[in-house]
């Protein structure tokens, strides 16, 4: 058994020092290198947790792998939950990757509520983070939304905990190999039918070969800059959102001419105003709103199921009657 892992890692120390060790948690245990590493890490930090494994039955070996994980957890005196959803062939659905993720998260949420777990540990690492950031770049995400996954974030009212986001995959594998720990090699992670697998198997190696340098660390640096930008934007936005009022037509966001001199901030203020009402505005929609504000022209726009009225010096989300 691995007794201590990354004892001098300051980021891990900071993460676990902020954790309430009197509470109990879930660990999403796939059996791969990442989740097994995290399992031993949690044991070494005296975290009380239950491992949960979802066997989709996609591989011929998955039944035996689930049994092996159950035996390992029994050996390590770790409570273990096995879930087997109705078998689905991963080649039968175009959205199976996201569907499987949604199923897992709903399962984690239900278990946390039923058994009073305080959060779920997930084994995402630095390479996963880099993939997420590059994917968001290609999707055209806002500069303030390139921060990637957070070490702690709420899924509804359940905490998702990712302490490994700064640790590269190769260090995780090296640590397990040095202790002769066996882990599952999930072939579906290499199935290029899935976007993540294509990025991992083809895109990242290609970019690193052409660029001639590691691209993971610059992407992680970009995520750090994005997180700082997001924090700054939120600070700058707060005073404007405090001016939102209810009037006879709905929610009114007053817009002063001075704000319009900074289009980046003006559009972010509008974006957050819409988000606070549960509305996600695209870049093109925000640009349209900004253009009308700049010209002082009046416009009635549709955003999902709501009407947005733009006029000189203000934006109104009309009430639903």
Swiss-Prot record:
Enzyme superclass (EC): ligase
GO (cellular component) term, any one: cytoplasm
UniProt keywords, alphabetically: ATP-binding, Cytoplasm, Ligase, Nucleotide-binding, tRNA processing
Gene Ontology MF terms: ATP binding; tRNA(Ile)-lysidine synthase activity
Residues bound to ATP: 30-35
Catalytic activity line of the entry: cytidine(34) in tRNA(Ile2) + L-lysine + ATP = lysidine(34) in tRNA(Ile2) + AMP + diphosphate + H(+)
Disulfide bonds: none
Main location per the UniProt record: cytoplasm
Pfam families documented for this protein: ATP_bind_3
Chain's role: Ligates lysine onto the cytidine present at position 34 of the AUA codon-specific tRNA(Ile) that contains the anticodon CAU, in an ATP-dependent manner. Cytidine is converted to lysidine, thus changing the amino acid specificity of the tRNA from methionine to isoleucine.
Entry domain remark: The N-terminal region contains the highly conserved SGGXDS motif, predicted to be a P-loop motif involved in ATP binding.
PANTHER family: TRNA(ILE)-LYSIDINE SYNTHASE-RELATED (PTHR43033:SF1)
Family recorded in the similarity comment: Belongs to the tRNA(Ile)-lysidine synthase family.
Name of the protein in its database record: tRNA(Ile)-lysidine synthase
